[in-house]
Regions:
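C-terminal functional module detector
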Residues: 1-9, 208-212, 217-342
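A metal-dependent hydrolase metal-coordination microenvironment
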Residues: 2-156, 160, 167-168, 184-199, ...
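Histidine/acidic-residue-rich catalytic or RNA/ligand-binding cores of hydrolases
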Residues: 25-28, 168-177, 193, 222-242
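A general structural signal for stabilizing positions within well-ordered secondary structure
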Residues: 36, 172, 204-205
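Alpha-helix termination/capping residues and helix-transition junctions
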Residues: 39, 175, 207-208
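Glycine-enriched alpha-helix->loop->beta-strand junction motifs that scaffold or abut catalytic
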Residues: 41, 63, 176-181, 235
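Extracellular structured ligand-interaction cores
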Residues: 42, 91-94, 154, 178, ...
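Functionally critical loop-and-helix segments that line ligand-binding/catalytic clefts
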Residues: 198-204, 219
Length: 342
């Protein structure tokens, strides 16, 4: 009998869970972003403008779902220059996605963190009066308090671009109760960073902090569309498997781990059968099985051939595993980590 880690029914929906529009420091309007991403096969777009949640229900149609969300920044405010391109110290960024479509109340509101066009939307900000002018301080205690408040406020919390942020192990390993982290971030990659965060993900998992992994563009679209090497859309994404394209079905699928992160490769099925972890995928050069064990496992192709299926026998002491696909073109797909014995 098969035990599916990613549900076997429903449809996969392509999602960008990190996106900036003219509401903050992006160049494209929310409507322009919808048109662009729909053209490229996306069904879900989280409008994660900086430090302000502005919903876009008018953009909803049968083939496109906007998610209510924002990117919350934590840094040492008195070191912040307030201007794009300037340096500031000690940042941590969190993506907050409202689980329910009618949730527009931000947590940990602080108007001093608004910049670029976001300052023009302050009058539309919705938040609990008890959290007005929340004192954001770059400490693990404060960041954990924000995460907990976000959960109580009905948000799915993603740890964004740890490589871009320059956060180090002794700090980020103290973060607790994250729902997911960005294993890839395309804007950071386009800037020149190696924002493939396998190591950070494993750090959390090995420390007992279980979470999913996602990927997003973090697009700002300041360069000519598609032709410029720094164009930062449609590079990394999250595939979400859900029964239908409805708001709560999509956020519930994220919560349940019915998703994978990619920059080109695909995972079609992931399940356990006869004591083995089995995965079917797009044409791959290599499929690897990573766990809490000292030794990973891998299946490789011979020259001129490709893999579309792999299976692995877990070690008896494996507590969790994750799968990584390396396509013949060098593109990746990352499964979430899943517990083996539950």
């Amino acid at each position: 009998m098969k035990k599916y880690f990613i549900r076997n029914d429903g449809e996969f929906y392509k999602a960008n869970l990190h996106c900036h529009s003219t509401v903050s420091d992006g160049k494209l309007s929310p409507d322009e972003l919808k048109k662009f991403y729909k053209k490229h096969g996306y069904s879900v777009l989280a409008y994660t403008d900086h430090n302000i949640l502005i919903a876009h229900p008018e953009l909803r149609d049968e083939e496109f779902l906007p998610l209510n969300s924002y990117e919350l920044s934590v840094f040492t405010l008195d070191k912040y220059s307030g201007a794009a391109g300037k340096q500031y110290e000690k940042p941590c960024h969190l993506i907050l996605i409202a689980k329910e479509e009618n949730n527009l109340d931000m947590v940990c509101w602080n108007r001093n963190f608004l910049f670029a066009n976001a300052v023009n939307y302050e009058s539309q900000a919705k938040f609990k009066k008890s959290e007005d002018n929340y004192d954001r301080v770059y400490t693990p205690d404060c960041i954990n308090d924000i995460i907990n408040r976000a959960h109580k406020g009905g948000y799915y919390v993603i740890y964004a671009h740890p490589t871009w942020s320059g956060e180090i192990y002794p700090t980020y390993i103290q973060y607790k109760n994250l729902d997911a982290m960005e294993i890839m971030n395309y804007s950071s990659i386009q800037e020149g960073n190696f924002e493939f965060n396998d190591r950070v993900y494993d750090d959390f998992l090995l420390d007992g902090k279980f979470m999913s992994c996602v990927a997003g563009d973090d697009n700002h679209n300041h360069y000519p569309p598609e032709t410029n090497p720094k164009w930062d859309s449609c590079g990394t994404y999250t595939m979400i498997k859900a029964p239908k394209l409805e708001y709560r079905e999509i956020t519930k699928a994220l919560e349940e781990g019915n998703s994978y992160a990619s920059n080109g490769a695909s995972i079609y099925d992931l399940y356990m059968e006869d004591g083995k972890v089995c995965v079917s995928c797009s044409d791959a050069y290599m499929v690897s099985y990573v766990s809490n064990a000292l030794w990973a496992q891998r299946m490789n192709t011979e020259e001129g051939t490709s893999l579309t299926y792999a299976e692995f026998a877990p070690h008896e002491y494996d507590k969790w595993f994750r799968i990584k696909i390396v396509g013949k073109d060098g593109k990746f797909a990352y499964s979430n980590a899943y517990r083996l014995y539950f």
